[in-house]
Structure formats: structure tokens, C-alpha cells
């Protein structure tokens, strides 16, 4: 199915591939780690690199972070975002980090030092920006950035950076996880809420 998404539009990507966020490079590498199908992995490299470059061209802000509408980010409507708002969100920036790390690892696997370094530097840059700009030091949480200011709301998407092991292993960031089990935080009878249940800073 991934060949259809990337090559099903007269040899090019399907139209929606250019609108909705994804961590496909990370996923394709993850599949290789399971099935060992190197031929499939290498066959996808040019497609994955082209997709990465496209996101850089269309969704990178002047500060180096990436923006996305909440609907196109798989969140439908959210407190922090908007369908047509170009806000830097923890989600897409984590995806771009994960994809850059994956492409760098593919470069290492194939002996392509230039590719490995290119995407390794991109990943390092995104990591620094996410930790410096999306971390709200008052709320102790990764939050969406509206222009030059935080959206000032803690949402479940603030945990996405950990899916890609982006944050430094530090109590500075680990403190965010105490909200998961807090019934006044994200904990609810049927799973996590999409946003925090209270608005004041954590005690």
C-alpha cells in the first residue's frame, strides 16, 4: 500500500500525501528492522527523501520549526490549533525528527556518509528547537507554539516527542509524565483526555 501512496499518482505521490503529517520514513525503517527486507527499504529511499524535502519547502517556518493544521495533523479540532493556522506543533516536529533520524540511520546502513550526516544534522537541529521553543517551562510540558508564544495549553500531543526518543533523558522533561496518572490531569476512565483537565500550573 505504501507504493500506492508514493507512486500511485502517475508515478508520483497521492495528493493527500502532501497535506497530512506522517512518520513514514521512521515506519519504513521500523518494518525493515522486523522483516529484514533491505531491498524494499532501499527502493523507498528516494521517495522518502523527496517527501522530506517537500515538507521542508512547504511547512517549515522561518524559525526552523514545522507547522501543521490540527486536522491535517490527525487531531481534528484542538484547543491549540486550527484548520488553517500555521502553528508549530509537537506532533509534526516530532515526526520530522523521527524521519530525519531514520534517514540518517539508512545512510549509515548503506555506507552513505553524506546522507547520514545530512539528516543527522537536521535531526539535531529539530531536537534543539523542540526543547528550546516548544517546552513550556511554567507548565513543564511540550506545547504548541502560536507565532512567538506558547498556546498555553497542555494536550496529549505533548507526549509525542517521546515516541521518537527526542527529549533528553532528564528530570526536567520527565516531570511531564506525572500528568498521565493524575485524574486532574490526563487520566480518565476510558483513556487519556486530549487536553489537561485543569488549567493552572502543576503543583
Predicted regions and their residues:
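C-terminal extensions
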Residues: 15-17, 95-105, 125-133, 148, ...
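Aromatic (Trp/Tyr) and acidic
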Residues: 86, 93, 151-182
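Active-site acid/base region of carbohydrate-active enzymes
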Residues: 1, 32-91, 114, 118-121, ...
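Well-ordered alpha-helical scaffold segments within catalytic/enzyme domains
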Residues: 23-40, 94-112, 160-170
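Alpha-helical scaffold segments in soluble metabolic enzymes
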Residues: 54, 102-105, 175
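Aromatic-lined, polymer-binding surfaces characteristic
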Residues: 1-28, 69-80, 89-100, 107-110
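Conserved small/polar residues in nucleotide/adenosyl-binding loops
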Residues: 198-203
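Short acidic-hydrophobic sequence patches enriched in Asp/Glu that either
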Residues: 20-23, 40, 44-47, 122, ...
Amino acid at each position: 500500500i505504501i507504493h500506492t501512496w508514493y507512486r500511485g499518482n502517475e508515478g508520483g505521490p497521492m495528493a493527500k500525501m502532501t497535506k497530512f503529517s506522517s512518520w513514514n520514513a521512521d515506519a519504513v525503517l521500523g518494518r525493515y528492522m522486523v522483516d529484514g527486507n533491505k531491498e524494499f527499504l532501499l527502493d523507498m529511499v528516494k521517495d522518502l527523501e523527496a517527501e522530506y524535502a517537500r515538507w521542508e519547502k512547504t511547512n517549515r517556518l522561518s524559525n526552523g520549526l514545522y507547522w501543521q493544521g490540527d486536522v491535517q495533523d490527525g487531531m481534528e479540532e484542538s484547543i491549540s490549533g486550527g484548520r488553517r493556522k500555521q502553528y508549530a506543533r509537537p506532533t509534526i516536529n516530532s515526526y520530522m525528527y523521527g524521519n530525519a533520524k531514520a534517514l540518517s540511520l539508512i545512510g549509515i546502513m548503506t555506507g552513505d556518509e553524506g546522507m547520514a550526516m545530512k539528516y543527522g544534522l537536521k535531526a539535531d537541529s529539530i531536537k534543539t528547537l523542540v526543547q528550546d521553543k516548544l517546552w513550556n517551562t511554567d507548565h513543564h510540558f511540550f506545547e504548541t507554539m502560536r507565532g512567538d508564544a506558547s498556546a498555553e495549553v497542555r494536550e496529549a500531543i505533548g507526549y509525542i516527542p517521546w515516541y521518537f526518543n527526542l527529549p533528553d533523558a532528564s528530570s526536567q522533561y520527565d516531570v511531564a509524565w506525572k500528568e498521565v496518572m493524575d485524574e486532574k490531569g490526563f487520566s480518565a476512565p476510558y483513556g487519556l483526555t486530549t487536553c489537561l483537565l485543569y488549567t493552572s500550573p502543576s503543583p
